Amino acid sequence: MQEKISKFEDFLTQLQQNITTALEQHETNAAKFISDKWQKPDTHDQKLKGYGNSMIIEGGEIFEKGVVAFSRVHGSELPPSATAKRQELAGKSFIATGLSLVIHPRNPFVPTSHANFRIFIAGADTDNPIWWFGGGFDLTPYYPFEEDAIHWHQTAKNICDKHDKTYYPKFKKWCDEYFYLKHRDECRGVGGLFFDDLNDKSFDECFNFVTDCANSYLDAYIPIVAQRKNIEYSQKHKDFQLYRRGRYVEFNLVFDRGTIFGLQSGGRTESILSSMPPIATWKYNWQPELGSEEEKVYQYIKPRDWIK
């Protein structure tokens, strides 16, 4: 099992380089991804041990802020967020390895994107370790372009169908349900793929699906960035982007399993919260004008079948 974990780690660290390099090629000023390598030592007072590399870009003309973060951590006991639906795992030791990214563009016409790919092994120090993969990618637009959502979902469907034709409808629905703000009765964006507890096939089959899915993120996102990054925008557009970013913050702090897991397990706070947008705003009881571009987005982000 250790060999398989290391193989996934090698894939993720190479993917991190591929993604940051591809994104930097679209940046038009001197902003670059900066590498922040960290390590939590094996000491008795640390709940979580391990290491990682958070790559951050800030202040770009195209990417106002972005993080592509790798981590490999282990602990003596899974936190409550990881065992809420699997009580049989309570008290087990664990290893978790993953890559998580969030990209916040400056231009309101370029959507925010998020992706995460991970493996968990519970009871890795026992004769019968329990493994599962999780991950996916999702898109959060501020202004609607139907062709962008279609391209995003078509890319997701193509990679799923290569492995299992039941995956796309199942993981698309799961994504719509997961990235939903109950207190707002709103979806965070137009969704994509979300899966967890993936171990329905052999390890190698699941590994191949997850790595193919991870490799397709750039195919899904880069064409949208290239198409929208030079669209002129007004202060009104920017203000609406900042207002909608507030929903992103609310979801991450209230519902996101990765954030909750990291904080409950004593993870590295700076890396866990690096996905937050650089600026977000809240307006009391604000409502968009009827018929405005801003009002349209609330219909646009409702779950639908994007691929006819």
From Swiss-Prot:
Annotated Gene Ontology cellular component terms: cytoplasm
Gene3D superfamilies hit by this protein: Coproporphyrinogen III oxidase, aerobic (3.40.1500.10)
Amino-acid positions noted as binding substrate in the UniProt annotation, renumbered to this chain: S100, N116, F117, R118, G266, G267, R268
Keywords linked to the UniProt accession: Cytoplasm, Heme biosynthesis, Metal-binding, Oxidoreductase, Porphyrin biosynthesis
Record flagged with keyword Cytoplasm: yes
Pfam families, per the entry: Coprogen_oxidas (PF01218)
Enzyme class per UniProt: oxidoreductase
Self-association state and partner proteins as the record states: Homodimer.
Family recorded in the similarity comment: Belongs to the aerobic coproporphyrinogen-III oxidase family.
Protein name: Oxygen-dependent coproporphyrinogen-III oxidase
Species assigned in the record: Francisella tularensis subsp. tularensis (strain SCHU S4 / Schu 4)
